[in-house]
Curated annotation (Swiss-Prot):
NCBIfam families recorded: dnlj (TIGR00575), PRK07956.1 (NF005932)
BRCT domain: residues covered: 595-673
SMART domains linked to this entry: BRCT (SM00292), HhH1 (SM00278), LIGANc (SM00532)
HAMAP family assigned: DNA_ligase_A
PROSITE patterns: BRCT (PS50172), DNA_LIGASE_N1 (PS01055), DNA_LIGASE_N2 (PS01056)
Organism: Synechococcus sp. (strain JA-3-3Ab)
Cofactor(s) the protein needs: Mg(2+); Mn(2+)
EC number: 6.5.1.2
Official protein name in the record: DNA ligase
One Pfam family matching this protein: DNA_ligase_aden
Example of a GO cellular component annotation carried by this entry: cytosol
Active site: K119 (n6-amp-lysine intermediate)
Lineage: Bacteria, Bacillati, Cyanobacteriota, Cyanophyceae, Synechococcales
Length: 673
């Protein structure tokens, strides 16, 4: 190989990477488009003639020629949490008050410093760089795991294949948002309409769908963009001091060649946060934006504030006001859910709302019906609750037609005819019949859902057939179905029947936490199921637990604990669990024991400062796995305060109350094993 050719290839790669960073990160192009294209073609021709010159970070290697067959599921080394939402300034103030309490601070100690970032309406991504090279890109998924879509990530031109540094961290985890510029979204929809295809509903849906394309050439053609907003260095920072604030993180991301939204700003106190929010609320931006993300600037205070089951306590999304539209109520139906809750649902004249077509909206309950005085034929004001679920929020009574009909919930279940009940103190009307077909359908659909047993092909229509035609009554019945049973159903042939039975049988291997979530215990969501499964690694152990023991687990509480105990005490549920265990579900030994001793059972800990070797989350997990509970604030009920370097005001509070202090080493010594 001619050394001059190798040198030229290196020069071209370096120049093209520098030009990309100047264009996408600094918005300051250093090359005309025609010059960039000429240099790109020169590198392409060199690599075509001498394939040994091709490197993984070459700009010519962004788009592969061969479509992927599927996207494997991968675990996130660092979870991607959701954000708590605030829909008005009062909720924002309440969040800050909670933050003050968690940090053990008062307003008199000075305003907190925040970083405000525009909340781009796109798809969250997790990027992993190893020794400076892009190794993996994945979707957010459920926050714990997502799909490995690396070929598609490489096709997004603003995401660098190599970090712009000679001394990268050994591993760098980057979080950001892939989005579709509005102009590009409109271009794609024009082309789809011209081709006779239905247009995409909104840029977010288009971006998410594009990222899951099996052919990365489609991704490249749609010209997605990307903004990075977080970074983590799990194996250390290479040289100098690591970032100490969120603002420094954004600057480091930019220095590494990753695009960062230039409209972010440091704000001192909520007054400046509100000014930032108002400044951009009505702005015409080149991308969809649905609010402002407010984050504590100090990384040390972020770590001290910690996380709830779902959200970081140190960040919140201040959402823009929800879009509201009027439309006519054509009918109202009573919908029965898997718990027996009866919800009035308005069937509407279809209307476009927040980028999607809405034809049904919730009326919540009987109290809401009475409060709104809803009539069939009314013109209703509809909005999306939390930007997700359409709901009726008002009635334009001045537009009520003479033939409008008042609506009241039925006295008997529309599915099974059982007299409905409304427990004292509850707003929800319920069907008490455990054999109600609607409840059975809901339970089966929940069991088969993606976050539970993830049974592909077992959707709403198929579940209805199983209940109506084959007499399926419990989730255990699913595992007794054969292809011959299914072939009797409309639309099911030999091949599709075998495929569904295989999907059902595969789900036997799902872990205990998914089974637990799939059981549909009240108040037990995905995260709660994971926590319970960690502490009680078999159904028998959880079934034997007392409510007070369950309530001691960090992140659970009395209401969830009582619901769990009540569920396991029901004879019908005990029978179902026995049937599942006989079927080998969940797939674990019949006798399981806790992995570690419970030497810290009943003890309450508070952590303050930075520990020498353990992160705050690692220390919390260590304590909880041994039966202890980690709380956010110091009180007289606190047993120990674990103190690291640079502690906060919690140290003074502990000293004032005479609470024992522990170093990290003293903490670990509490369990000699």
């Amino acid at each position: 190989m001619d050394p001059k050719l190798e040198q030229r290839a290196r020069e071209l790669r370096a120049l093209l990477q520098k030009a990309s960073i100047a264009y996408y990160v600094h918005d300051a192009p250093i090359l005309e488009d025609s010059v960039y294209d000429r240099l790109y073609r020169e590198l392409q021709e060199l690599e075509r003639a001498y394939p040994e010159l091709i490197t993984p970070d070459s700009p010519t290697q962004r788009v592969g020629e061969k479509p992927a067959e599927q996207f494997p599921t991968v675990s996130h080394r660092i979870p991607l949490y959701s954000l708590e939402n605030a829909f008005n300034l009062e909720e924002l103030k309440e969040w800050q008050e909670r933050l003050w309490r968690v940090l053990g601070r008062t307003p008199e100690e000075g305003e907190l410093e925040y970083v405000c970032e525009l909340k781009i309406d796109g798809a969250a991504l997790a990027l992993t760089y190893v020794d400076g090279l892009l190794q993996r890109g994945a979707t957010r998924g459920d926050g714990q795991s997502g799909e490995d879509i690396t070929p598609n990530i490489r096709a997004i031109p603003s995401i660098p294949l190599r970090l712009a540094t000679a001394a990268p961290p050994p591993v760098l985890e980057v979080r950001g948002e892939a989005y579709l510029p509005i102009a590009e979204f409109e271009r794609i929809n024009r082309e789809r309409c011209s081709a006779g295809d239905p247009p995409f509903a909104n840029p977010r849906n288009c971006a998410a769908g594009t990222l899951r394309q099996l052919d990365s050439r489609v991704v490249a053609a749609r010209k997605l963009s990307f903004f990075a907003y977080a970074l983590h260095w799990p194996e250390g920072w290479p040289s100098g001091d690591p970032p100490q604030t969120q603002w420094e993180c954004l600057q480091r991301l930019k220095d590494l060649g990753l695009p960062v939204n230039p409209l972010s700003q440091v704000c001192r106190g909520l007054e400046e946060v509100v000014q930032f929010y108002e400044r951009w609320r009505q702005a015409q931006l080149p991308y969809a934006c649905d609010g402002v993300v407010v984050k504590l600037n100090s990384l040390r205070l972020q770590e001290e504030a910690g996380f709830t089951q779902k959200f970081p306590r140190w960040a919140i999304a201040l959402k823009y006001p929800a879009q509201e539209v009027p439309t006519r109520i054509r009918a109202i139906v009573a919908s029965v859910g898997r718990t027996g809750a009866v919800t009035p649902v308005a069937e509407l004249e279809p209307v476009l709302l927040a980028g999607t077509t809405v034809s049904r909206a919730s009326l919540h309950n009987a109290d809401r019906l009475e409060e709104l005085d809803v009539h069939i034929g009314d013109t209703a004001i509809v909005r999306k609750a939390g930007e997700i679920i359409p709901e009726v929020v008002g009635i334009l009574k001045e537009l009520r037609p003479p033939d409008a009909v008042p609506y009241r919930l039925p006295s008997h279940c529309p599915e099974c005819g059982t007299l409905l009940v409304r427990p004292a103190g509850e707003a929800i009307t319920r069907c008490p019949n455990p054999a109600c077909p609607a409840k059975i359908r809901g339970q089966l659909q929940h069991w088969a859902s993606r976050d539970a047993m993830d049974i592909e092909g077992l959707g709403e229509k198929r579940v209805a057939q199983l209940v109506e035609k084959l007499g399926v009554r419990t989730v255990a019945d699913l595992y007794r179905l054969t292809p011959e049973h299914l072939e009797s159903l409309e639309g099911m042939g030999s091949r599709s029947s075998q495929k569904l039975v295989q999907a059902i049988q595969r789900s036997r291997q799902q872990p205990w936490e998914r089974v637990l979530y799939g059981l549909g215990i009240p108040h037990v969501g995905v995260v709660t199921a994971q926590i319970l499964a960690q502490h009680f690694p078999a159904p028998e152990l959880l079934a034997q637990a007392r409510a007070e023991d369950i309530a001691q687990i960090y992140g659970i509480g009395a209401e969830i604990a009582e619901a769990v105990v009540a569920w396991f005490a029901d004879p019908a549920h005990q029978k179902l669990l026995q049937e599942l265990r006989e079927l080998g579900i969940p797939a674990l030994p019949r006798q399981a024991a806790p992995a570690v001793s419970q030497v810290l059972a009943g003890k309450k800990f508070v952590i303050t400062g930075t520990l020498p070797t353990l992160s705050r989350q690692q220390a919390k997990a260590w304590i909880e796995s041994r039966g202890g509970k980690v709380t956010a604030s110091v009180s007289r009920q606190t047993d120990y305060v674990v103190v690291g370097s640079d502690p906060g005001s919690k140290l003074k509070q502990a000293q004032a109350l005479g609470i024992p202090l522990l170093s990290e080493a003293e903490l670990l010594a509490l369990d000699p094993k």
